Amino acid sequence: ASQKRPSQRHGSKYLATASTMDHARHGFLPRHRDTGILDSIGRFFGSDRAAPKRGSGKDSHHAARTTHYGSLPQKSQRSQDENPVVHFFKNIVTPRTPPPSQGKGRGLSLSRFSWGAEGQKPGFGYGGRADYKSKGFKGAHDAQGTLSKIFKLGGRDSRSGSPMARR
C-alpha cells in the first residue's frame, strides 16, 4: 500500500506538470491552428487533473480571456472584410500568413488571423492586433512606395540607364 501511494502522488504531479506545460507550449506556439480546441481540451483536463482550486480558477480565467480576445479581432475582421484592399496589403505585409491561405479565400485567412490573436493572448492579442492594423497600413503604403521606387530604379532606370551608358 505504501508503494502504491507515492506512485499515485507522483502520477498526479506528473500530470499536473504536463497540463501546465501543455498550456505554456500552446501559448508559446501561435502557429497551432486549433488553439481554441487545444485550449478547451487543456482547460477540461487541467481542471480534471490539477488541484481543482488552482486548475479551475486559472483555466476559467484563461477561457474568459481567450473568448474575449477571440471576439475582439473578429470585430476588426469584419472591417477588414469590408475593405479587401487593406486585407490584401495586410496579407502581403504580414509574413505570418502563407500564400495558400491567401489563395483559398477570405474565410480561411480570417480564421487564421483570429487564431493568431488568440495565440498572442497575454493581453497583447488585441493591443498588438490594433497596432498591427495601423502599422500594417503604413507599412503597406511604405512598402508600396519603396517597391515602386525599386521597380522604377531597378527595372526601368537600369534598363534605360545601361543603353544610355553604352551610347
Curated annotation (Swiss-Prot):
Record Pfam families: Myelin_MBP (PF01669)
Region (Disordered): 46-114, 136-167
Citrulline: residues carrying this PTM: R25, R31, R129, R156, R167
Modified residues (Omega-N-methylarginine): R43, R49, R106
PROSITE patterns linked: MYELIN_MBP
Residues recorded as bearing Phosphothreonine in the entry: T17, T20, T35, T67, T94, T97
Residues that bear Phosphotyrosine: Y14, Y69
Residue numbers marked as site, Cleavage: F89, K90, F113, S114
Annotated spans, Induces experimental autoimmune encephalomyelitis (EAE) 1: 45-87
Function: Is, with PLP, the most abundant protein component of the myelin membrane in the CNS. Has a role in both the formation and stabilization of this compact multilayer arrangement of bilayers. Each splice variant and charge isomer may have a specialized function in the assembly of an optimized, biochemically functional myelin membrane.
Protein name: Myelin basic protein
